[in-house]
Amino acid sequence: MLHPVWGCVVAVMGVLWFYSSGVQSQCWEHSQCRDLASEANILECIQACKVDLSAESPLFPGNGHLQPTSEDIQNYVMSHFHWNTFGQRMNGTPGGSKREGASTALSVLLEALSQPRDEVERESEEEEGLQQHRRDDKRSYSMEHFRWGKPVGRKRRPVKVYPNGVEEESAESYPAEIRRDLSLKLDYPQGEELEEVFGGENDLLNLQKKDGSYKMNHFRWSGPPKDKRYGGFMKSWDERSQKPLLTLFKNVMIKDGHEKKGQ
């Protein structure tokens, strides 16, 4: 059974021989590769071949674009992108392989999907309550710009006028007995006085009806002067001026005289 070191040496030599075959066997012609009896000579030959390949020959001779890149170059290229890191272990050390990173991501996904149902429902209820609170705040903000939204300050009460001349003190501040006495002290018209007041108005209405014309004396259009009725257009023939008609006849007569002279 071969030693692990010799197995690695044989594998590396095979790779170098495969790559060096396309560059006219420059590696095997090197002076350090003629004596391969010892392990030190083999390592020196490998080092010399690597230097020759990197300095004189391309990385992939022939159809190099169809061949996969080496692991070193692939790692160098992938180190510049964030997806080169496939997660971290639980103890804080970076993941060793893609499979470990994928398993870590899968475990995180399973933990997120396996949350209790009550927590999800509670989160949804909190979100709905927050949205409702935002809608209420927006509605109250818009209603503040109108007078029916929120009254500004204290509502002003109407001023009450009392017949006894006391306006500063309200009658509601008095006790019930005093308020009753105040109401009894008010001077209300008696029956005879009411008959005199309404009797005089009835006599006036009867006189107006006897004349045959009922006029609304409380309004300005009850009886306007004749010269101002309908803007002065409803005047009689006698009241109107005769000058426009005389001027018309005069103009007609002058026109007829000119026509006869022309003939």
From Swiss-Prot:
The modification Pyrrolidone carboxylic acid is found at residue 26. Residues 114-142 are annotated as: Disordered. Coiled coil: none annotated. One of its GO terms (cellular component) is extracellular region. Pfam families: ACTH_domain, NPP, Op_neuropeptide. InterPro entries: Mcrtin_ACTH_cent, Melanocortin_N, Opioid_neuropept, PMOC, POMC-derived_peptides. Keywords: Amidation, Cleavage on pair of basic residues, Disulfide bond, Endorphin, Hormone, Pyrrolidone carboxylic acid, Secreted, Signal. Disulfide bonds join 27-49, 33-45. GO terms for molecular function: hormone activity. GO terms for biological process: neuropeptide signaling pathway. Residues 130-142 have a biased composition (Basic and acidic residues). The modification Valine amide is found at residue 152. It comes from the Eukaryota. Specific enzymatic cleavages at paired basic residues yield the different active peptides. Residues 1-25 form the signal peptide. It is found in: Secreted. Belongs to the POMC family. This is Pro-opiomelanocortin. The lineage of its organism: Eukaryota, Metazoa, Chordata, Craniata, Vertebrata.
